[in-house]
């Protein structure tokens, strides 16, 4: 293939000149030829983003651009970035280019696939109405997940997105006999390390492929690592499997796009985001889908800047999801974990035709009780509980019990809390909340409902408290 030379470097964006008759195509991967006389990364990969004309292409460096200088030779591979896919990737940790970073030798697979693929056609898609039980009460009741659906965990800094994601991985990936792909996009290296050991200790490492592009990596890596993970998941789906695809964190994918967009010379849009925000998000999300051959169930953590759900990045993500789990700082401040907001979280599956009449009516009754408590809170703050009518007092007492019963000890937090994690089946969850709403446990103290599993544990705890 043709060779070119570097003519300009601005951070992660590098301009490279090729002969006019052999310009690389957009998304072609280019490789740095010889970096022996400098401390630049040997074999550094660039991805073409724009053709500027006159043989010059503007590229993103997928690695550190330290040590690059004008005049260095670059070769065109003639094809997009391709990564190893298939069963050889299971149990391995890879970077954005599919290179192993777990010091366990090369990835044993001959099959490579380009990270830029078209989304499945409309007639290939397969909608699903089968529910996926998570064992987390608040999620199963208020915002149930669909098998083959897309789920977003929305929350600001420090309200528990990653802990919730780890618990979902613990409950679903371990119960689920299929394969999982985990894409760590711009998150902490420590979390990736914890995830690896969590999987190893529970003996499911041989069913998980891991791709990491962490916070300390250049924006090119963080921008493409989600596509690398997705390409591996698509390959398993296309052989007829049901795949779990975890992404932590979608916001960092957007942020990397913002960093790159400014360097590429594009005019910023609202709040400084890239003008192509919706298109970039759509290109990723439209590929995360289930076909008639196999399914991808994806669970994505979404950081919410300054707790503002109307920020363009989380607002653009909302459009693509089947279930949204919103984590609230106010609920976390009450010490209720998982800090899921039952009034803000939604699911397309919460429909009597999908979940059944009983589940639907219990979930709505729980939400109505909590909504009433929310409305009465201002009156209580000003006038106190004594000024409420007997009916309102009863509604508040039940709402406080429901609020506490929505908390649950997690398996992944055992080491911090000292209390063993609980998995609660959907049947037990519905029965428990139905009994509280119907007033069967009005005589029990509200402390008995805090941080327990099923309703039987509430009765045991109440006996101890008395």
From Swiss-Prot:
It is a peripheral membrane protein. Keywords: ATP synthesis, ATP-binding, Cell inner membrane, Cell membrane, CF(1), Hydrogen ion transport, Ion transport, Membrane, Nucleotide-binding, Translocase, Transport. SUPFAM superfamilies: C-terminal domain of alpha and beta subunits of F1 ATP synthase, N-terminal domain of alpha and beta subunits of F1 ATP synthase, P-loop containing nucleoside triphosphate hydrolases. ATP binds at residues 155-162. Gene3D superfamilies: 2.40.10.170, Bovine Mitochondrial F1-atpase, Atp Synthase Beta Chain, Chain D, domain 3, P-loop containing nucleotide triphosphate hydrolases. Pfam families: ATP-synt_ab, ATP-synt_ab_N, ATP-synt_VA_C. Produces ATP from ADP in the presence of a proton gradient across the membrane. The catalytic sites are hosted primarily by the beta subunits. Belongs to the ATPase alpha/beta chains family. This is ATP synthase subunit beta. It comes from Azoarcus sp. (strain BH72).
């Amino acid at each position: 293939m043709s060779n070119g030379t570097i003519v300009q470097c601005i951070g992660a964006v590098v301009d490279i000149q090729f002969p006019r008759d052999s310009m690389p195509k957009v998304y072609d991967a280019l490789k740095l030829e010889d970096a022996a006389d400098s401390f630049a990364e040997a074999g550094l990969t660039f991805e073409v983003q724009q053709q500027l004309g006159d043989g010059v292409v503007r590229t993103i460096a997928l690695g550190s651009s330290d040590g690059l200088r004008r005049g260095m030779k670059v070769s065109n591979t003639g094809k997009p970035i391709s990564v190893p896919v298939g069963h050889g990737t299971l149990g391995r940790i890879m970077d954005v280019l599919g290179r192993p970073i777990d010091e366990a030798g090369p990835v044993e697979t001959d099959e490579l696939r380009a990270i830029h693929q078209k989304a499945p056609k409309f007639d290939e898609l397969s909608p699903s109405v089968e529910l996926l039980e998570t064992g987390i009460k608040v999620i199963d009741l208020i915002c149930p997940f669909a098998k083959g659906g897309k789920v977003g965990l929305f929350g600001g800094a420090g309200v528990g997105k990653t802990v919730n994601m780890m618990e979902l991985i613990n409950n679903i990936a371990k119960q689920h006999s299929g394969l999982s792909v985990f894409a760590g996009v711009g998150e902490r290296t420590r979390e990736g390390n914890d995830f690896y050991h969590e999987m190893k200790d529970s003996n499911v490492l041989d069913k998980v492929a891991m791709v990491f592009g962490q916070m300390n990596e250049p924006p090119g890596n963080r921008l493409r690592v989600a596509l690398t993970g997705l390409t591996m998941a698509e390959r398993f789906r296309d052989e007829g499997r049901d795949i779990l695809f975890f992404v932590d964190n979608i916001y960092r994918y957007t942020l990397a796009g913002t960093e790159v967009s400014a360097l590429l010379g594009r005019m910023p849009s609202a709040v400084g985001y890239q003008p192509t925000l919706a298109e970039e998000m759509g290109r990723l999300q439209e590929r995360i889908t289930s076909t008639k051959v196999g399914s991808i169930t994806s669970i994505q953590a979404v950081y919410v800047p300054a707790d503002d759900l109307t920020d363009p990045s989380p607002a653009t993500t909302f459009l693509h999801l089947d279930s949204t789990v919103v984590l609230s700082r106010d609920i976390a401040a009450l010490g209720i974990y998982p800090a899921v907001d039952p009034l803000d979280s939604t699911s397309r599956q919460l429909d009597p035709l999908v979940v059944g009449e009983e589940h639907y009516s219990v979930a709505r009754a729980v939400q109505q009780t909590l909504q009433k408590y929310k409305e009465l809170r201002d009156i209580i703050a000003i006038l106190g509980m004594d000024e409420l009518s007997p009916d309102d007092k009863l509604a508040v007492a039940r709402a406080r019990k429901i609020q506490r019963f929505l908390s649950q000890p997690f398996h992944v937090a055992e080491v911090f809390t000292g209390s063993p994690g609980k998995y609660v089946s959907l049947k037990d969850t519905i029965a428990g909340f139905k009994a509280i709403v119907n007033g069967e446990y009005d005589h029990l103290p509200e402390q008995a409902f805090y941080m327990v599993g099923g309703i039987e544990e509430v009765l045991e705890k109440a006996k101890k408290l008395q």
